[in-house]
């Protein structure tokens, strides 16, 4: 297995400084870049392990703490394993940070993350890939639509409210996307019901975006997150194959 090197770094943004986890093969040569968007629980050991796995496949991976305006990660105290009974209190504590991350603020930040990756000697020239989980899937989709000249691949897993009726819903950026797209939805996910899955699919198809959308039978919201009760090993394995296949094709 490829040895990777991970570290915590700081990235200047228009609104401050974002802490982030950076990981890459420990071989001294540049690699294609991947912008990895966290779920709502944020930067924590499980996510850094996931990022390391992507890096081991031959990528330089950046995982920003997108809630940096409310403090360095972890923004709120998290248990080693997040039990269902603890989720309401955790989300209550996270709500101010989540609500302050408006689409406009998130995309200003995305420009800073992409600029940092472009300037880094650890990355190759050319476009990046982006992947996101839970709310991060929406951030990945917005990034691909806001910076189409910089993003060649976008993946999202158990994404939330990607095609709502809100006037700033992420799916409304579909006609700006030039990247190849993959979404893996959970069929037991109230945050991404069938009507939103269909609306997202219709938007991508109408825009002529090269894409693939799959619904993972029996999976719940958060199925990739091994430190939660929603984890589904089979669905997580399926996600890894889909993600790494996409990055391998597009980058």
Which residue stretches match the model-derived regions?
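N-terminal cap/leader regions of alpha/beta-hydrolase-fold enzymes
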Residues: 1-251
């Amino acid at each position: 297995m490829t040895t990777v090197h991970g570290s915590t770094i700081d990235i200047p943004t228009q609104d401050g400084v974002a802490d982030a986890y950076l990981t890459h093969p420990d071989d001294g040569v540049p690699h294609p870049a991947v912008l990895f968007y966290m779920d709502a629980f944020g930067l924590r050991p499980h996510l850094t392990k996931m990022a390391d796995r992507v890096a081991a496949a031959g990528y330089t991976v950046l995982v920003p703490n997108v809630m940096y305006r409310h403090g360095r990660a972890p923004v709120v105290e998290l248990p080693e394993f997040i039990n269902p009974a603890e989720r309401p209190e955790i989300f209550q504590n996270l709500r101010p940070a989540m609500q302050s991350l408006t689409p406009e603020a998130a995309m200003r930040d995305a420009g800073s993350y992409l600029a940092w990756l472009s300037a880094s000697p650890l990355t190759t020239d050319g476009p990046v890939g982006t992947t996101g989980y839970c709310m991060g899937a929406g951030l990945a989709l917005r990034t691909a639509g806001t910076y189409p000249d910089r993003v060649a691949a976008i993946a999202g897993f158990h994404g939330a409210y990607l095609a709502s009726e809100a006037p700033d819903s992420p799916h409304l950026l579909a006609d700006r996307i030039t990247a190849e797209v993959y979404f893996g939805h959970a069929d037991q996910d109230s945050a991404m019901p069938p009507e939103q899955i269909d609306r997202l699919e219709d938007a991508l198809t109408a825009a002529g975006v090269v894409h693939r959308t799959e619904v993972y039978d029996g999976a719940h919201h958060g199925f990739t997150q091994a430190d939660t009760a929603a984890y589904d090993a089979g669905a997580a394995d399926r996600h890894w194959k889909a993600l790494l296949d996409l990055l391998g094709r597009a980058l």
